[in-house]
Amino acid sequence: MKSLQALFGGTFDPVHYGHLKPVETLANLIGLTRVTIIPNNVPPHRPQPEANSVQRKHMLELAIADKPLFTLDERELKRNAPSYTAQTLKEWRQEQGPDVPLAFIIGQDSLLTFPTWYEYETILDNAHLIVCRRPGYPLEMAQPQYQQWLEDHLTHNPEDLHLQPAGKIYLAETPWFNISATIIRERLQNGESCEDLLPEPVLTYINQQGLYR
């Protein structure tokens, strides 16, 4: 069996420690050697990003320049249509073949809305889900049929992610950082410091570009 590949999607507007540090911990916990970051172009589930795709891509490049764990996949940025995880995972599965273990990393908040995602039922056909826990969010789905779906696919053994190509959901005990892109944008608009919230090269670039003012 080939090594587990993990994908991490998001808007990253801007990228910050709340994105990077939990995933770095996750990698150590379950034995990931590479995490591919996939920034959205037009996210279908949330407001449009304030920074454009070129700026968000550059901030990510700055953030991961000294972090060999991470690599960047630009495919969604090159689409002129909404970015759907189901579509991206189908492409990855076709490129990697049927036997490579593949996982998609999401937050616990995203798990609760997961049944509203485009073609959500196909996602586990192509990948595992790794859920980073977050305080204040329930561990149960809102509807009984979705709770059953969760329980049917749930595993408590991260080794299962390495041994099967897709189909499992793993709830990871990752640290939670009280950081969000919204908080960072509000701080910047108010002229407050963000030095402790995101990598220094990213903050320097934000100031150079006059972003989030």
UniProtKB/Swiss-Prot annotation:
Keywords of this entry: ATP-binding, NAD, Nucleotide-binding, Nucleotidyltransferase, Pyridine nucleotide biosynthesis, Transferase
Enzymatic class: transferase
Recorded GO MF terms: ATP binding; nicotinamide-nucleotide adenylyltransferase activity; nicotinate-nucleotide adenylyltransferase activity
Catalysis: reaction(s): nicotinate beta-D-ribonucleotide + ATP + H(+) = deamido-NAD(+) + diphosphate
Regulation of this protein's activity per its record: Activity is susceptible to product inhibition.
Disulphide-bridged cysteine pairs: none
Pathway: Cofactor biosynthesis; NAD(+) biosynthesis; deamido-NAD(+) from nicotinate D-ribonucleotide: step 1/1
GO biological process terms held by the UniProt record: 'de novo' NAD biosynthetic process from L-aspartate; NAD biosynthetic process; NAD biosynthetic process via the salvage pathway
Pfam families listed in its UniProt record: CTP_transf_like
EC number, UniProt record: 2.7.7.18
Role description: Catalyzes the reversible adenylation of nicotinate mononucleotide (NaMN) to nicotinic acid adenine dinucleotide (NaAD).
Family membership: Belongs to the NadD family.
Protein's UniProt name: Nicotinate-nucleotide adenylyltransferase
